[in-house]
Amino acid sequence: MTCQTYNLFVLSVIMIYYGHTASSLNLVQLQDDIDKLKADFNSSHSDVADGGPIIVEKLKNWTERNEKRIILSQIVSMYLEMLENTDKSKPHIKHISEELYTLKNNLPDGVKKVKDIMDLAKLPMNDLRIQRKAANELFSILQKLVDPPSFKRKRSQSQRRCNC
């Protein structure tokens, strides 16, 4: 219960964050709906503040716009999962869910990207077969780290030529 109630605050932050970019969001209505959702979860309970934020804190580590879109995609999915376990007949829950689905459709598939990261973390790097494959791929990985994408290279070359 504590996780869910504190997550409602983060839901507010996400809705407001995307409200600046998605003009179709009615933030006043969403704030009212989120307040009703907070009441449903009794989020004014004292245990909500115990341990500090659980999701907002994670956003601090993701600084670039595309990175944030990946993590926000995961967070939106979490809220949709949380709302699946609530009374969907309530209009405020239905409205929040609809808005979250709309936001989710405008975000990259963060689940796939997170799965890729988890798969990499699980690779048994002491396995000889994995080591062989990794050694075979090392140079191309290093090239991707060193070589800037062509559009950045072209932009930096044109900036160097300009003597303005």
Curated annotation (Swiss-Prot):
Keyword hit for Cell cycle: no
Lineage: superkingdom: Eukaryota
Residues listed as glycosylation sites in the UniProt record: 42, 61
InterPro entries in alphabetical order: 4_helix_cytokine-like_core (IPR009079), Interferon_gamma (IPR002069)
GO MF annotations, alphabetized: cytokine activity; type II interferon receptor binding
GO biological process, one term: positive regulation of tumor necrosis factor (ligand) superfamily member 11 production
Gene Ontology terms: cellular component: extracellular space
Keywords: Antiviral defense, Cytokine, Glycoprotein, Growth regulation, Secreted, Signal
Residues passing through the membrane, by range: none
Location of this chain's protein in the cell: Secreted
Range of residues in the leader sequence: 1-19
Family per record: Belongs to the type II (or gamma) interferon family.
Record-linked PANTHER family: INTERFERON GAMMA (PTHR11419:SF0)
Subunit structure: Homodimer.
Function: Produced by lymphocytes activated by specific antigens or mitogens. IFN-gamma, in addition to having antiviral activity, has important immunoregulatory functions. It is a potent activator of macrophages, it has antiproliferative effects on transformed cells and it can potentiate the antiviral and antitumor effects of the type I interferons.
Name of the protein described by the UniProt record: Interferon gamma
